Design a protein with these regions (language model features):
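Short glycine/proline- and acidic residue-enriched helix-loop micro-motifs
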Residues: 93-101
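Polyanionic, low-complexity intrinsically disordered segments
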Residues: 1-43, 57, 62-71, 81-85, ...
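Flexible hinge/switch segments at interdomain interfaces of large molecular machines
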Residues: 79-94, 207-211, 278-282
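Conserved beta-strand segments of alpha/beta enzyme cores
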Residues: 47-48, 271
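Long, highly charged amphipathic alpha-helices
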Residues: 35-39, 52, 56, 110-113, ...
């Protein structure tokens, strides 16, 4: 399907011209200017004109033009033969729609193509990496890195410079790491890009984290929890006070779980405040504070200030040190519900980690409501997954999933709810093994067993569960 009208014109005039090779159909709305409509009819052999609702057509225009963009590899190939470094330093607005910048300077087109394809593929990160004789661009999709294109090594410095201009970084400083941010739109979708540059042996490398603001409406039901875990976790986040911990490595979906938890809270009658590093998504009705190392605004200092703001619920992006842990525990003991993340491998080790930080066991036993550990597993592509004779599902690979066999991700969880038996063990500084044994007696289901549920349902593969969990 071809769309002959330029994206900017189609968007502004609310017209979509579709050419399937047999006929040309022009879609318009009641807001379409008659003069623009007449001009398109004069220049193109239109078979028929159809009317559509304004909001529906606007969304459809953004969707079809975004999906119809040339691949990054194609654009990079074109750019390598026509790069014009003299236009590299053009001004670029802080927010723009990349689909409207298709005819810009070659390096700009290359970077726009990479960003557009990354958004289309659902990538969470873009890696731009220099080596001695080559360079590479890789996307992280569903938690796994894959190479997308190898641009000419001679273009690498120009690409990084263009990126620095967009992120408002110092293009002359190549010796120090730099961090910046880009706000842009791709086919009507608002996307925040966090940019990190790092000097390496063969030039600067860059990693771009993509945050799609249109996907910021989270619900606990959509995270893949089993029915029992969902019910238990929901009860925890509706307690009037105490602390709930969500644990796991970087990229395991901890912040998403906390955001979804906050979505369950009635913010009209509750004061909800967060301290984060960084603020990943803006949440309606919630006061969000970002730590800032440059001005010495740490988690601890931000939390002390938050406690003077009459909060009911406090979310802490990460407990990193004793000061933050101590304030979180004290807040939970003085009538606040505290939701926080922690870097541990499983739920029981969250308890020993806090004690190792210096938290007194008697305080922790009085305040901790529960700890949930989690990982993200890739979901089998529904278009190509196959089942063997034993009833076990396996990845295959097709065009829909980029030949990986997987498309999308979901969570595997283990939730340890603190009961009287566990409280006594925590108070007595019990070992992790004792905590785990007591939790299992109370119905605790380890993460790998939760993964087995997803395997049995055909959601993911056995190999994928083994990859992200441990014995």
């Amino acid at each position: 399907m071809k769309h002959p009208l330029p994206y900017g014109f189609a968007k502004a005039q609310q017209m979509l011209l579709e050419d399937d090779g047999r006929e040309r159909v022009l879609w318009a709305t009641d807001n379409t200017a008659p003069s623009a409509l007449g001009e398109v009819l004069r220049l193109h052999a239109v078979s028929r004109v159809e009317r559509e609702d304004s909001a529906v057509l606007t969304e459809r225009i953004a969707r079809v033009y975004a999906s119809g963009e040339s691949s990054a590899a194609t654009v990079v190939g074109e750019v390598e033969s026509e790069v014009d470094l003299s236009r590299l330093l053009q001004d670029l607005p802080a927010v723009e729609d990349l689909l409207e910048a298709a005819n810009d300077a070659p390096i700009i087109r290359m970077l726009n193509a990479l960003l557009t394809q990354a958004a289309k593929d659902g990538a969470s990160d873009i890696h731009i990496e220099p080596y001695e004789r080559s360079s590479a661009v890789r996307f992280r999709v569903d938690g796994t890195l894959r190479e997308v294109v190898q641009p000419n090594r001679a273009l690498h410095a120009a690409l990084i410079s263009r990126l620095k201009i967009m992120a408002e970084l110092d293009i002359a400083e190549k010796r120090l790491p730099q961090d910046g941010r880009i706000s842009l739109r791709i086919g009507g979708r608002a996307i925040d890009v966090r940019v990190s540059t790092l000097p390496s042996a063969h030039g600067e490398r860059a990693v771009l984290r993509l945050l799609d603001k249109s996907e910021s409406k989270f619900t606990l039901e959509a995270l893949g929890m089993s029915g029992e875990v969902l019910r238990s976790f929901n009860r925890l986040v509706h307690q009037p006070h105490g602390i709930v911990l969500v644990t796991g490595p970087t990229g395991s979906g901890k912040t998403t779980t906390l955001y979804a938890s906050l979505g369950r809270i009635d913010t009209t009658s509750t004061n909800v405040l967060t301290v984060e590093d960084p603020i990943e998504y803006e949440l309606a009705g919630i006061g969000q504070t970002q730590v800032n190392a440059r001005i010495d605004l740490t988690f601890g200092k931000a939390l002390r200030a938050i406690l003077r703001q009459d909060p009911d619920v406090i979310m802490i992006g990460e407990i990193r040190d004793f000061e933050t842990a101590q304030i979180a525990i004290q807040a939970s003991l003085t009538g606040h519900l505290v939701l926080a993340t922690l870097h541990t491998n499983d739920a029981p080790s969250a308890i020993t980690r806090l004690i190792d930080m210096g938290v007194e066991p008697y305080l922790l036993s009085s305040s901790l409501l529960g700890a949930q550990a989690q990982r993200l597993v890739r979901k089998l592509c529904p278009a190509c997954k196959r089942v063997d004779g034993d009833g076990r599902w396996h990845p295959v690979g097709c065009a829909a999933c980029g030949q990986s066999g997987y498309k999308g991700r979901t969570g595997v969880y283990e939730l340890m709810v603190v009961d009287d038996a566990l409280r006594a063990l925590i108070h007595g500084r019990a070992a992790e093994s004792e905590l785990l044994a007591a939790a299992k007696t109370g119905g605790f289901v380890p993460m790998r067993d939760d993964g087995a549920r997803l395997v049995a349902e055909g959601v993911t593969s056995f190999e994928e569960v083994l990859r992200v969990t441990r014995d």
